[in-house]
């Protein structure tokens, strides 16, 4: 399957981020190894976030054939030091694995995810 991708919208209170909305966007690369978000979809998502009083928290994408950790390309393309980068691995479709990372200067650090 192709990688899925999108934006994460929510609220921030210090280091605590609460996800309120996920915006699934078109992967214009149509690839199982890469993704690029449709710029028009990104703009629409950010406008919707503003209308709802939430802020962009980061982005998400899937790894259909690899673990849920940032690839070298993911690290290289991580331009926002404040963003959360969520990756879901679907290598085992029966047990998907979701992880979130902050990436600064090509170094990734896993963030805790709390489901409420």
Model-found features: residue ranges?
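Conserved beta-strand-loop surface patch within small alpha/beta domains used
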Residues: 1-56, 65-116
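Short, well-ordered beta-to-alpha junction loops that form the rim of enzyme active sites
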Residues: 62
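Conserved, mostly hydrophobic/aromatic
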Residues: 59
């Amino acid at each position: 399957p192709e990688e899925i991708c999108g934006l994460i919208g929510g609220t921030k209170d210090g280091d605590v981020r609460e996800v309120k909305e996920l915006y699934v966007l078109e992967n214009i690369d149509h690839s199982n190894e890469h993704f690029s978000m449709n710029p028009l979809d990104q703009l629409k998502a950010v406008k919707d976030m503003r209308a709802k009083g939430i802020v962009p928290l980061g982005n998400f994408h899937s790894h259909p054939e690899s673990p849920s950790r940032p690839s070298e390309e993911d690290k290289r393309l991580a331009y926002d030091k404040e963003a959360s980068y969520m990756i879901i691995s679907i290598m085992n479709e029966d047990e998907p694995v979701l992880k979130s990372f902050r990436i600064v200067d090509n170094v990734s650090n896993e963030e805790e995810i709390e489901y409420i």
